[in-house]
Amino acid sequence: MSSLADTVEGSEAKRGRFSNNALTSDTGILQKNSTLRNWFLKPTADLKNSCEDRVEDDVNDVYLNDKNSQKSVEERKLGRKVRSFFKQTNSNKDESVLEDEDDALVWKKTSNKCAKKENSHDIQKGSFTKKIRNSIFKSANDVKEFRNENNLLLPVELSSDDENESHFTDANSHVMQSKSPEKIPSKDQCLTKGAKNKGLKKEYEKSFEEYSDDSDDEFSPATPPENVLEGPYKFVFQTPNTFTSQPNITVENDFHKGGRHVIDYLNKKLATMNIDIDLTSGGKQNVSWEEELDQLSDHVIESITNHISKGRMHAQEKQDELEKLKLENLNLSTLKQENLQHKQEINSLKDNLESISKKNNDLILEMNKLKKKSTNNKTNEYISTDENENEEITKSNMGPGILELNVNETSKKLQQSTFKPSKYLPRETRNNENRLKHLEKRIFGLEKSLEKKKKQVRADSVRLDLNRYTIDQFLTLLKSLSEVLQFHNVYGNDLKENDDNIIKIETCCSALNMKNCFEDSSFRLQENSFKRQLGPLFANINFSLIDQLTMNFRFYERSANFQKETIGGLRMMLQDKDNYIKTLMQHLKKKESTKLIKDSKNGASTLTS
């Protein structure tokens, strides 16, 4: 947002401090100091419907002077314009020559034309202080209707860094409104007059467009407040009844905390988020409200980040716990499924056994019934055959109503019929017998399979887990097992059949003392016998490791035997040497004895001679 006040000193931070009394007194700072007047008055214009004829050229001159950094010339020109305006608004009838006649004439024309079109009750006479007083203490019925709100110029921007004074902002302030837009030259005419400074005009137009876009802020109302001066220029004085809250002036040591609304908003938001932060802690009187806001914002950001990081850590821990619980649940579910499967298998086997036993009982009953029926049928058949064959009945000694049978023949035939083979039996009996045989074979096979399963369960319960043992412990265990095997003479036999021996081996291994070492070479293990006999016991271990261990064991044994053999050879050598020495000594003794004998003989011969 561009304005004349920004070109005087270059920044808003360098503006002077003043109170409300300076605006309502004839001999105040605003009347005496030209720079304050220039800061206070900001006669900018809307290029469409406001005074542009002279003001825009002056603004362009100021922009040029600002680029050339001629601050003294700027202050002089602005001082002339402001003085001419105040002399005209104070209703002085002196029409003496001003310092800049052209500028004064422009302001007079605009003010007179605006005054003609006003109503009688809107015309205000008197000094500048009366206008201010009338604007502040105006009644509610005398509120003026602002028809041309779009013609409002840029707002006056007054700032005060004093802690106990009012703050003037752009949001609730309005400036000069032209009351004679009919005789103001058009935009094209203004642009032709200042053809030299086209670039500056474009920048100036952009600044107004930016302000028009920003004018829809929530703090800038559609209609200006009541405390607005009337005339060619309108001023706004912020009172405690306006938009923003003001500090208590009565308290001397109170200091204004500029971000109080922001702090309240943050307190509410943090309370909804269940975050406890003392935003009022750490406030110092010597620190400005901007620095205090920065400190508070940093404190809030740090606390929020810490809270978020803690929340993330808790969430991660919960996720890890949930994953662990999920894994445990999966393991439990798998175990439950396996248990259910085993139970179902056991129940199915039980059902099969019960059904088979029932079938056996039924078949036994049927067999008994069939046997009874077969005996009855046999007797009936035999009787029928006997009757057919014995048709020749003796009737010689037969009285009335008496039959005589040949008893001898019937008895012989009955004896022959009892020795009939099975092929002469009826089909039903033969089929039932075949069924019984088949069922008996099946029952026999099931009983064998059950016995095998029982043996396997016993063997599995007896097996050892060698993964628990170290290498040294395993070597000692091998030695102890070899001793046990030699003691029980299990070589050449399968350990599956010798359950008692397996149990004894397990007891010996459990009662094994690791300090015992068997150094005898007679307790060697052979690979083939080891694999053949101890395979079912050590089903969970790799035989390559056993081979390596046995090879190492054999190497140590061979080295020990070699040492023993070398020692034995040395002993033999020593013994041979001893024998050789003995033989030499004997030989020497013999030589000495022969010499003595010869000497004695020679001596005797000499004596005789």
UniProtKB/Swiss-Prot annotation:
Residue positions of the PTM Phosphoserine? Answer: S159, S160
Query: Where is the secretion signal located?
Result: none
Bias (Polar residues) ranges: 169-179
Query: Which residues lie within the region annotated Disordered?
Result: 1-24, 162-225
Single GO cellular component annotation?
A: prospore membrane
Example GO biological process? ascospore-type prospore membrane formation
Output compositional bias ranges, type Basic and acidic residues.
Answer: 200-209
* Keywords assigned: Phosphoprotein
> Acidic residues composition bias: which ranges?
210-219
Can you say what this protein is called?
Spore-specific protein YSW1
Its ancestry begins with: Eukaryota, Fungi, Dikarya, Ascomycota, Saccharomycotina
UniProt gene name: YSW1
